Amino acid sequence: MAVEALHCGLNPRGIDHPAHAEGIKLQIEGEGVESQSIKNKNFQKVPDQKGTPKRLQAEAETAKSATVKLSKPVALWTQQDVCKWLKKHCPNQYQIYSESFKQHDITGRALLRLTDKKLERMGIAQENLRQHILQQVLQLKVREEVRNLQLLTQGTLLLPDGWMDGEIRRKTTLLLGQTGVRENLLLFLHRISIIENSIQI
């Protein structure tokens, strides 16, 4: 469902138009598994802790493949996390970028707000290098938005202190019906449209 959502978007007037996402590659854990919560208008139950160990292990593996990996949100990344991301996505210019990013204290939140002008002020003079970084940041933003939408449809909450752990989630009832999912999808599409317009690839 979330991957299909990338092929359309909303303009400021609310009219659907194609989202220009050429060249963006997404690798989403659980891709291709349609959420039962949308079909049934309910959320899947957490498996009972009764049963054989083999059954519990099989249920845990099935649940793991259908959910999004709960990694740290980009906005909470440290300088070190940003440098790891740089090394993976910009290996050829990593030394230059990492020094500049460290000098300017670029954390995850700052990474998401980078612009062409900011990169130029940071000393990255070549336009093609700045555009490469911005393309990678755009892909990161899209992955983050897709993950957030998946977490919303699964009923996982992000609290100020971090992710809810499983025990609290079992005790908390989250009622997010079909209307809530639709509203979240529209919000997601609007955010993607804003991201595309801000980067202007």
From Swiss-Prot:
Disulfide bonds: none annotated. GO terms for biological process: cell surface receptor protein tyrosine kinase signaling pathway. GO terms for cellular component: cytoplasmic side of plasma membrane. It holds the Pfam family SAM_2. Expressed in the brain. InterPro entries: Aveugle-like_SAM_dom, SAM, SAM/pointed_sf, SAM_domain-containing_protein. Signal peptide: none annotated. Keywords: Epilepsy. Residues 77-143 form the SAM domain. The keyword Phosphoprotein does not apply. The keyword Amino-acid biosynthesis does not apply. It is linked to Epilepsy, familial adult myoclonic, 1: A form of familial myoclonic epilepsy, a neurologic disorder characterized by cortical hand tremors, myoclonic jerks and occasional generalized or focal seizures with a non-progressive or very slowly progressive disease course. Usually, myoclonic tremor is the presenting symptom, characterized by tremulous finger movements and myoclonic jerks of the limbs increased by action and posture. In a minority of patients, seizures are the presenting symptom. Some patients exhibit mild cognitive impairment. FAME1 inheritance is autosomal dominant. This is Sterile alpha motif domain-containing protein 12. It comes from Homo sapiens (Human). The gene is SAMD12.
